Amino acid sequence: MKRLTYPLSSLRNIVEHFHCNTFHKPISSLSISPTLKSESREPSSTQDPYSLLKQDPVDICLSLWVKSFSSPPSATFSNLTGFLSKFDLWVLAYQRTCAHVTGTFPPRNAIHANALRSLLSLQNAVTRSGGKFRWNDKMNQYVRSPKDKISMNGGEGMSKGKVRRIIESEEPIFQDRVVHEVLLMILEPFFEARFSSKSHGFRPGRNPHTVIRTIRSNFAGYLWFMKGDVSEMLDHVDVDVVMNCLQKVVKDRKVLGLIESSLKFSDKRVLKRVVEKHGNDNGLGTKRRIEREKRNKTKKKILSDDEPKPDPYWLRTFYSFAPKEAAKVPSYGYCGVLSPLLANVCLNELDRFMETKIVEYFSPCKDDSIWKESIEDGCHNPAWPEFVPSSGKEKTRKMDYIRYGGHFLIGIRGPREDAVKMRKEIIDFCDRVFGVRLDNSKLEIEHISRGIQFLDHIICRRVIYPTLRYTGSGGSIVSKKGVGTLLSVSASLEQCIRQFRRLAFVKGDKDPEPLPCNPMLYSSQSHSNSQMNKFLETMADWYKYADNRKKAVGFCAYVIRSSLAKLYAARYRLKSRAKVYSIASRDLSHPLSESSNNSAPEYSDLLRMGLVDAIEGVQFSRMSLIPSCDYTPFPRNWIPNHEQVLQEYIRLQDPKFFCGLHRSIKREGLTLPQDEISEAVWDFKTLGAWRSKYENKREADDGLQKLDSQT
């Protein structure tokens, strides 16, 4: 019997590293002079915050995930205020918020007592019925950021202009971020257990790679594709729509009230942005703003000791290659990191609607080569889908759906009329449920032969002519030429060129010419090569599941290597890339130096003395060094590892499982896996069959006798 067990420590480590895949710029909390505070916040003098630290917060999060995944899908949760009252969760939320703001995760025992008392005051203001907590209350902050420069005894005040800019800022303050983290840790488990498996955006364990692998595995055989765009829901959504979706799972009034109050600020913020955008300043304000932005770009910034370092150049460059489906992050009112979760809560209604339509549309046909009987038939290899004939009147009708963020893709095996009908139903559903009116431009229908771009990958069909060999009636080998189609998922080189051109790495369209990498002008050769190597490694991983991975990564390596060569030619006065390559070699790993500086010591001497860093060559200088596409099979009903661990852990906690295990041990006894393998090999070697596939000894003897009579 095959058993899969996970220790509690393994499950604990997985739950401990759950996080929201949303990137926000680190910000500082408001620092207001004590003279501006409207009222003082007195923490509870009767409660010692250290006495409230009773549990490990990771164990509390673990219990939430186990409870949510073990509950039936239709279950609702009406008492979540008890989790809000657990001070251990607030301490963990404070630690995570500090990590976002300062870049370091403070240990629990390193948090100052004053910070714990302020955190307790914030908890009381949120949880108690008469609490005075308000979102974005910059004049009355309970908890301050560790980056706050104002000391506890007063400190120095700020100028009126800086105070006004902070008050008018739309960035959430530190204490709001703490409340966001607490609500996220409580709400995420209950909704993750009920989200559709068709959704992959802003969810733990899922990413664009899982979307691409799912398309390769499940979307073979579809002729018509519909690419939908509902990303306007990531910018603004009606408060009633969000609350109605939340109330299907959460019934706690306190939690719902906190979320509703944070969403109501959304309309005011949108209105403020519209007024600022269309304001009448006769061009003077815009001109000053542009000049100020230029000065800020060229101004050298000195980081504080506790300020996180900005992202390195290679990472900023890679983020610029983000596809449009993954570039937009939801932002609702003052919800902060809760916004992606709330967006998925709303769009989950669309996922469930499409799952119902998929079942209704399925119409099997015995004469087809795939999906003859069941919608779950997987008769072709999930890594390399088998040859799929075209659909017709007598062929199977089938549909599939997948969503990433505010963009989704629908594959239809049937006539185009069915795709048009499905588009009308989606438009009516979004108008009725979300109040969003979509036009046909947001729901484009394309044939597979034209290619569909999704997540900067092109989904198309390749026609191939394989030679099919089979054994004829007389025992001879028959070879026959066949025709088939193969689903292809390849990287979009046109989109890659556009991104390089936008970042000033190349110029031109059809035959792009590399440009020097000016941002690395004042960096050393070793640092420049190291930065570009990290970028190329990340790009090679991004195109990991593209059929043309070698071609795409090879083009990126050519652009980066040529850009660096032009930069070195200008820096070391070598006039051309050819001279740079002749000195530094093809991968630019040999040191370069100015020809006019003959008194400079040799690079080998400086390297031996530790005065310079070793120069690593630019990767992927030859096509043979670029890894091929990863065709690892992807299961059709794939679920992330943390969900597998949770399901297995819940199953091991069920007494019925151990009763069944005990009965099987009493009936079959204990055997080692090595013994079972040896028995199977011996049976196949001596008898040509495995005894264990029969239920009893009599069936085994009858089956073996039939095999003997046939031979």
UniProtKB/Swiss-Prot annotation:
CC terms in the record's Gene Ontology section: mitochondrion
Residue intervals of the Reverse transcriptase domain: 147-459
UniProt-annotated stretches for the region Intron maturase type-2: 484-653
EC number: 3.1.-.-
Enzyme class: hydrolase
InterPro entries, per the entry: DNA/RNA_pol_sf (IPR043502), Domain_X (IPR024937), GrpII_Intron_Splice-Mob/Def (IPR051083)
UniProt entry keywords in alphabetical sequence: Endonuclease, Hydrolase, Intron homing, Mitochondrion, Nuclease, Stress response, Transit peptide
CDD domains, per database record: RT_G2_intron
Subcellular location: Mitochondrion
One GO MF term: endonuclease activity
One record GO biological process: regulation of cellulose biosynthetic process
Tissue specificity field: Expressed at low levels in seedlings and accumulates in adult plants.
Family according to the record: Belongs to the plant nuclear intron maturase (nMat) family.
Listed name of the protein: Nuclear intron maturase 1, mitochondrial
